[in-house]
Each structure stands twice: as C-alpha cells, then as structure tokens.
C-alpha cells in the first residue's frame, strides 16, 4: 500500500480518492462510536489515486445525490459498496515509485443496495473511467489492451451499468437483490445544475443539493 510517496511524486495529479466517505459511516449509538467510525476512513487503505477533475465532479456527486435526494424523497434505506477494478490491464504511472513501476486503476465501481416500500431489496451499479484524463495529462504510460470489457469505457465519465458487469470485472459477488437497471447498454450519467431556494438556510435540516443527475434509474 503506497502512501505519501505516490501523491507527492512528479506528475502526480491525483486526489486521495476516498472509497468510503467519512459522512457515510459517521453514525452510531454514541458520539464516540460515530467519531471512531468517521476516523476509520482516513487510512491509505481506503484511498485510491483518482484524477482530481473526476474525483471532484460527478463521481463525488453521485453518492451525495443518492443519499440526500433519492434516499430522502423515497425514504430509502441503502448500503453502498465501492472500489477500484484491479487488473493487469491497468496502465503504469509515468513516475517510478521507490524504483518500481506502479499500475494505476482507471476504472472504479459503485453498487447501491436499497429497500423499497414493497420491502424488497434492489440494487444498481455504476462505473467510472479516468483513463482518458490520465492519458491527456501524460500521467500514465499508455497500455494497449484488447479486453472488450475495458474498452467499453473510453470517455472520462460515469456510467450506470448492470451489476453483473461489475461482478464480471472485479471477480466479486455482490449481495443478491432485484436489479433496477437491466439494460445491456452502459448509460452515461449527466450532472445538471439546478437553482436552490434562496430562502433555504444552509443549516436547515431540509438539505438540498444544487444539482440533479439525469438518466439515473433507481
């Protein structure tokens, strides 16, 4: 597990992309439990190198949107799984670290499992690609691959995908649930800014985001 030496290296334009956000686990029966849970996210084992332009855009917004908008409006109880796709097809960082070439994951996934009013569990999957951004900024050495799965994600965007595709790419078995999205095509998500009611104070319990995500199926 690499730490500061990766994020301070020459040509490193990475954020420490938290897989699990502090806010997601900051809860518990006591304040101490909640604080310990929040602090548990500040380890390098919970961070992956993500290009700043992607980490701070729709990928970061996706979970906020689901938690604060969809969850609130539909009274959903959700559980989020997330991580990088680790593969021999991942490209090499242009700068050796400690004299070694380091592969950088360029695909990241997120699965949201939630319960609807019918009491049944549903799940949706998302995939994000940073390969194009890394290439354009000369951060990685281009690694050619004929892997058709990886080649589905050429743009630096976030897509809604079948959970089965995430399972195929990661080798993981996601908890079984009803798939809300069954299209075989990967659908690009679009972040659209909206106007926030100026009368709504920032400390209001009626938390409101300044954007919506179009093309999202839950």
Model-derived features with residue positions:
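Betabetaalpha-Me/HNH-type nuclease active-site subdomain
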Residues: 1-59
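An acidic- and aromatic-residue-enriched active-site/binding cleft used to recognize and process polar
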Residues: 19-24, 47, 56, 64-65, ...
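A short secondary-structure junction signal
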Residues: 25-33, 60-65, 90-95, 125
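A generic local secondary-structure boundary/capping motif
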Residues: 38-39, 68, 98-101
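Generic recognition of stable, solvent-exposed alpha-helical segments in well-folded globular domains
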Residues: 46, 61, 158-161
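Acidic/polar loop patches that form or flank catalytic/metal-binding clefts of enzymes
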Residues: 56-63, 175-179
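Short, glycine/acidic-rich hinge or "gate" loops at secondary-structure transitions
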Residues: 65-71
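C-terminal, well-folded lobe of enzymatic/effector domains
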Residues: 72-218
């Amino acid at each position: 597990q690499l730490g500061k030496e990766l994020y301070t290296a020459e040509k490193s334009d990475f954020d420490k992309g938290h897989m699990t956000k502090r806010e997601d686990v900051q809860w518990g029966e006591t304040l101490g439990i909640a604080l310990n849970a929040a602090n548990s996210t500040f380890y390098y084992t919970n961070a992956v190198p993500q290009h700043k332009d992607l980490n701070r855009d729709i990928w970061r917004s996706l979970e906020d949107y689901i938690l604060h908008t969809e969850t609130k409006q539909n009274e959903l109880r959700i559980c989020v799984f997330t991580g990088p796709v680790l593969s021999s097809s991942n490209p090499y960082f242009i700068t050796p670290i400690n004299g070694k070439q380091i592969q950088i994951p360029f695909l990241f996934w997120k699965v949201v499992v939630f319960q609807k009013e019918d009491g049944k569990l549903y799940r949706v999957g998302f995939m994000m690609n940073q390969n194009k951004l890394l290439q354009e900024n000369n951060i990685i050495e281009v690694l050619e691959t004929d892997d058709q799965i990886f080649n589905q994600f050429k743009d630096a965007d976030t897509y809604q995908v079948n959970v089965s595709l995430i399972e195929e790419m990661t080798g993981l078995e996601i908890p079984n649930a009803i798939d809300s999205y069954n299209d075989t095509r990967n659908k690009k998500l679009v972040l659209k800014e909206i106007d926030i009611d100026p009368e709504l104070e920032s400390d209001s319990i009626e938390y409101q985001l300044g954007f919506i995500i179009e093309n999202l199926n839950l």
